UniProtKB/Swiss-Prot annotation:
<dbReference type="InterPro" id="IPR000795">
    <property type="entry name" value="T_Tr_GTP-bd_dom"/>
</dbReference>
<dbReference type="InterPro" id="IPR005225">
    <property type="entry name" value="Small_GTP-bd"/>
</dbReference>
<dbReference type="Pfam" id="PF03144">
    <property type="entry name" value="GTP_EFTU_D2"/>
</dbReference>
<dbReference type="InterPro" id="IPR027417">
    <property type="entry name" value="P-loop_NTPase"/>
</dbReference>
<dbReference type="InterPro" id="IPR004161">
    <property type="entry name" value="EFTu-like_2"/>
</dbReference>
<dbReference type="InterPro" id="IPR014721">
    <property type="entry name" value="Ribsml_uS5_D2-typ_fold_subgr"/>
</dbReference>
<comment type="similarity">
    <text>Belongs to the TRAFAC class translation factor GTPase superfamily. Classic translation factor GTPase family. EF-G/EF-2 subfamily.</text>
</comment>
<dbReference type="InterPro" id="IPR005517">
    <property type="entry name" value="Transl_elong_EFG/EF2_IV"/>
</dbReference>
<keyword id="KW-0342">GTP-binding</keyword>
<keyword id="KW-0648">Protein biosynthesis</keyword>
<dbReference type="Pfam" id="PF03764">
    <property type="entry name" value="EFG_IV"/>
</dbReference>
<dbReference type="Pfam" id="PF14492">
    <property type="entry name" value="EFG_III"/>
</dbReference>
<dbReference type="InterPro" id="IPR009000">
    <property type="entry name" value="Transl_B-barrel_sf"/>
</dbReference>
<feature type="modified residue" description="Diphthamide">
    <location>
        <position position="605"/>
    </location>
</feature>
<dbReference type="InterPro" id="IPR020568">
    <property type="entry name" value="Ribosomal_Su5_D2-typ_SF"/>
</dbReference>
<dbReference type="GO" id="GO:1990904">
    <property type="term" value="C:ribonucleoprotein complex"/>
</dbReference>
<dbReference type="InterPro" id="IPR035647">
    <property type="entry name" value="EFG_III/V"/>
</dbReference>
C-alpha cells in the first residue's frame, strides 16, 4: 500500500468531518504557462501533507501519473488530490487540481475550472506573464475563479541572470503589474478591484518550487527578511535554511486558505453565472449556500476510463450530499443511474468514501453515461436547467488518419478511440462507414501525439498514423438567391437562401448567451437587442449548431404539415453543416433561412429519407451561389527576444504568411505579437530558435478563423478536393438541384 493511501485512510475520518463544514473547505488548482513549474509546486504541497518524501519533492512529479507525463516532464491531464492541512488551530480540506500548461491541453483546464473557486497561478520569474498565463487567467475569470499568484524560479534571477536585490524587486513588481493588467482586462466588473494582487496583503508568494521555499511580503516583513538575504542564501549556500524557515507548502496553503473563498462564499457569486435556474427556488437557495442538506446537484468536470471499474465521473457537489447507492438523474441524457461507489482522488489513486457533501470534489462509479459538462441531480429535479455548458477556447484543427496494421483489430481500436473522446471532448473522431478510415482531430500536434500514445498503451494494437493535416472551414461572403430542394420522390419542395451569420451572433453562441435549449422568447429578445435581428427572424430560430456556429431560421407562414417535418429539416441542416460542398470541410458562420415549402399530405411520402436530402441539397446550392470561401485556422505567437534579433525573427514570420500585430520594447527584451496560419506553423519553432541563436521565448495558441487568400483560393480548393479523392472541379449549384 502506498504512503499516500495509508495517510489518506488515516486522515479519512478527519477529512469527512471537515467535508461537512464548507467554511473549512477550499477548492483550488494550479494554472500556468507550460514549464513554469506547476507540477513541481504541487509536489511541495504533497510533501506538506506527508504524501511525498521531502527528498523527492520537486523531482517526483507525483501528480504527473500518466507515464508519458513523467517522460516528457509535462502535465497533459488534470489530476485531483484532497489535502488535509491545519492552519490557525483549525483543520482544512483543500481539494487541489494540477492542470496542464501546454496550449494543446487547455480543454483540461476548462473542465477543471468548473470545480475550482481559486486558481494558484504559477509564473516563471524569468519568462514572466506569457500567452498561456493570459489564456488560463482569462478562462479562470470567465468562470468566476479567483486567482492568487506564485512567482516561481526566483533562483533563476539570482543564478542565471545574476540580478541585484533591487533588480529582483523590480522584476517581481513588473510581473505583478502585468498580472493585474490581465485582471483589469478580463475580471467581472464587480471583482476588477477586489481581485487585483496586492503583495502587501499576502496575495502573492515568491520562491523556488525546486528548492522548496516560498515567502509572502507580510511573512518577510515579520521575519525581517530582505531580498539581499535571499541572494545571500544562494551565493553562500544556505538555501536549505530558507526551505526550513519558509517551506513552500506552508506558504502556498496559507495563501490559499486566506485568499481563496470557501465554497459557501464562492457559490453566492458563481452560481448566478453558471446556472440559469430560479435562484429563489429550494434548489436555487441550496446552490447559493452550498447546503449539504439540500437536493443533490453535481457538475461533472471530467470522465476517465478505468480498466476495472469502467467510466469514472469526477465532479463537484454544488448542493446536497451524494452517497453510495443514491439514484441520480443525468439532465440532457434523460436517464437515471445508481451510484455504485463514491471516492475522493489522490493523484492516480481513488479512496472510497461513504458520502461526499456540497462544496467538495467527488468521483463516482456507476454513471457510465455521464460526460464532462453534464449535470447530475436528485431524480425529483429532472426538469431543472443544467449548468452552463463549458466553453473551449481552442478547436480541433489538426487531423491524423489512423489505420490498424491488422484490419481485424479495427473494432477494438475504434472502441478505445471512442473512450478517448469521452475523456477528452476536445478530440474529434470521424469514421467513414464505407471505407473504415479513422480520422482523429486535436488542438495541435502534441495533443494528437499524446492521444495516439494513450491509444497504443491501452489497446496494444499496432497502427499507423498519417502526417498531420489541417482542418479547415467553409463559409459564405454574401446572401444567396433562393434555391428549391426537391425530395427524391418529387412530392416535397423546400425553398432556402443562406447568408453570412454576423459576428455578434457567433459570439453569442460561443459564450452560450443563446442556446438551443433556452426559452425561445428569451433567445429572440437577446438576438433583437444584442445582434440587431428583426423580430420575425429572431422568433423563427429552429436550431443552433453550437459546434460550428450556424443557425437555421423559419420565415414561412401558414405552411401545411411543416410542423410534422420540422425535425427532418433540422437533421438535414446539421448533415449539411458537417461537410460543406466546396471540399467536405465543416461549414462555419452561416445563417440558413427557410422561406417556403410544399409538403405532401401523406406521411409515407414525407419521411426523413425524403426531407433530409431535399434540405441538404438546397442548402448546398444556396451556399455555392453566395461567394463561398475557405477559412483557415490562425495561431497567435507571443515572442520575447533580444532586440538584436527582431529583424531575423520578423523575416521568419513574414516567410510563413504571418503578420506582426504588435511590438514593444522593455530594457533588454523586445515583445512581439504575431499571427500566422496553422498550416505554416509546423517548422516555425526550429526556424525561430535558429534566427535568434536560441535567445528567444515564444508561445502559440489558437487565434481565429480567417479567409484563405483569394488569389490562391481556387487552386487550394482543388488541392483539398484531390487529397480527399473528390473530383478536382469545384461543384456548381446545379450539381445539387435543378435550375430554378
Amino acid at each position: 500500500m502506498s504512503s499516500a493511501v495509508r495517510i489518506v485512510e488515516k486522515q479519512l475520518d478527519e477529512i469527512l468531518a471537515i467535508a461537512r463544514n464548507p467554511a473549512q473547505i477550499r477548492n483550488a488548482g494550479t494554472l500556468a504557462h507550460v514549464d513554469h513549474g506547476k507540477t513541481t509546486t504541487t509536489d511541495s504541497l504533497l510533501m506538506g501533507a506527508g504524501l511525498l518524501s521531502p527528498k523527492v519533492a520537486g523531482k517526483a512529479l507525483a501528480m504527473d501519473y500518466v507515464p508519458i507525463e513523467q517522460l516528457r516532464q509535462m502535465t497533459v491531464k488534470a489530476a485531483n488530490i484532497s489535502l488535509y492541512f491545519e492552519y490557525g488551530g483549525k483543520p482544512y480540506l483543500i481539494n487541489f487540481v494540477d492542470t496542464p500548461g501546454h496550449v494543446d491541453f487547455t480543454g483540461h483546464v476548462t473542465r477543471s475550472l468548473r470545480v475550482m473557486d481559486g486558481g494558484l497561478v504559477v509564473v516563471d520569474a524569468v519568462e514572466g506573464v506569457m500567452t498561456q498565463t493570459e489564456t488560463v487567467v482569462r478562462q479562470a475569470l470567465e468562470e468566476y475563479v479567483r486567482p492568487v499568484l506564485f512567482i516561481n524560479k526566483i533562483d533563476r534571477l539570482i543564478k542565471e541572470l545574476r540580478l541585484s536585490p533591487q533588480e529582483i524587486q523590480q522584476r517581481i513588481l513588473s510581473i505583478v503589474k502585468d498580472f493585474n493588467a490581465l485582471i483589469d482586462m478580463f475580471a467581472p466588473p464587480e471583482f476588477k478591484d477586489k481581485w487585483k494582487i496586492d503583495p502587501g496583503k499576502g496575495q502573492m508568494a515568491m520562491g523556488s518550487a525546486l528548492h522548496k521555499w516560498g515567502i509572502t511580503i507580510p511573512m518577510a516583513q515579520k521575519a525581517g527578511i530582505k531580498f539581499s538575504n535571499i541572494v545571500d542564501a544562494y551565493e553562500k549556500g544556505y538555501v536549505d535554511k530558507l526551505a526550513e524557515e519558509f517551506p513552500l507548502y506552508k506558504t502556498l496553503l496559507t495563501m490559499i486558505i486566506e485568499h481563496v473563498p470557501p465554497p459557501n462564499v464562492a457559490q453566492k457569486y458563481r452560481i448566478p453565472r453558471l446556472w440559469r435556474g430560479d435562484l429563489n427556488s429550494e434548489v436555487g437557495k441550496a446552490l447559493l449556500e452550498a447546503d449539504p442538506n439540500g437536493p443533490t446537484v453535481i457538475a461533472v468536470s471530467k470522465v476517465n476510463k478505468d480498466p476495472h471499474a469502467g467510466l469514472i465521473a469526477t465532479g463537484r457537489v454544488f448542493s446536497g450530499t451524494i452517497r453510495e447507492g443514491d439514484e441520480i438523474y443525468i439532465i440532457g441524457r434523460k436517464m437515471k443511474k445508481k451510484v455504485l461507489q463514491t471516492y475522493i482522488y489522490m493523484g492516480p489513486t481513488r479512496i472510497i468514501v461513504p458520502y461526499m457533501p456540497a462544496g467538495n470534489i467527488v468521483a463516482l462509479m456507476g454513471v457510465d453515461e455521464a460526460r464532462a459538462g453534464d449535470t447530475l441531480v436528485t431524480p425529483s429535479l429532472a426538469d431543472i436547467p443544467p449548468f452552463e455548458r463549458m466553453r473551449y477556447i481552442s478547436e480541433p484543427v489538426v487531423t491524423v488518419a489512423i489505420e490498424p496494421k491488422n484490419p481485424a483489430e479495427l473494432a477494438r481500436l475504434v472502441e478505445a478511440l471512442k473512450d478517448l473522446v469521452i475523456e477528452d471532448p476536445t478530440l474529434d473522431l470521424k469514421i467513414d462507414q464505407e471505407t473504415g478510415q479513422i480520422l482523429l482531430s486535436g488542438v495541435g500536434t502534441l495533443h494528437l501525439e499524446i492521444a495516439t500514445w494513450l491509444l497504443k498503451e491501452r489497446t496494444k494494437v499496432e497502427f499507423s498514423v498519417s502526417p498531420p493535416l489541417i482542418r479547415f472551414r467553409e463559409t459564405v461572403r454574401e446572401r444567396s438567391q433562393v434555391w428549391e430542394g426537391k425530395s427524391p420522390n418529387k412530392h416535397n419542395r423546400l425553398y432556402f437562401y443562406v447568408e453570412p451569420l454576423d459576428e455578434t451572433t457567433v459570439e453569442l453562441i460561443a459564450t452560450r448567451e443563446i442556446t438551443e435549449e433556452q426559452d425561445p422568447r428569451e433567445r429572440a429578445k437577446i438576438l433583437r437587442e444584442k445582434a440587431g435581428w428583426d423580430t420575425d427572424e429572431a422568433r423563427g430560430v429552429w436550431a443552433i449548431d453550437d459546434r460550428y456556429f450556424n443557425v437555421i431560421v423559419d420565415k414561412t407562414t401558414g405552411i401545411q404539415y411543416l410542423r410534422e417535418i420540422r425535425d427532418y429539416i433540422i437533421q438535414g441542416f446539421r448533415w449539411a453543416m458537417e461537410a460543406g460542398p466546396l471540399a467536405q470541410e465543416p461549414i462555419r458562420g452561416v445563417k440558413v433561412v427557410l422561406v417556403d415549402a410544399v409538403v405532401h399530405e401523406d406521411p409515407a411520402h414525407r419521411g426523413p429519407a425524403q426531407i433530409m436530402p431535399a434540405t441538404k441539397n438546397a442548402i448546398f446550392a444556396a451556399f455555392l451561389s453566395a461567394r463561398p470561401t475557405i477559412l483557415e485556422p490562425l495561431v497567435r505567437l507571443d515572442i520575447k527576444v533580444a532586440p538584436d534579433y527582431i529583424g531575423a525573427v520578423t523575416s521568419v514570420i513574414n516567410k510563413h504568411r504571418g503578420k506582426i500585430l504588435d511590438m514593444t520594447q522593455q530594457e533588454y527584451m523586445a515583445f512581439l505579437r504575431a499571427e500566422l496560419p496553422v498550416l505554416e506553423s509546423f517548422t516555425i519553432s526550429d526556424e525561430l530558435r535558429a534566427a535568434a541563436a536560441g535567445k528567444i521565448f515564444w508561445s502559440m495558441q489558437f487565434s481565429r478563423w480567417a479567409p484563405y487568400p483569394e488569389s490562391m483560393l481556387a487552386d487550394f480548393v482543388k488541392q483539398l478536393r484531390k487529397k480527399k479523392g473528390l473530383k478536382e472541379e469545384i461543384p456548381k449549384p446545379t450539381d445539387f438541384v435543378e435550375a430554378f
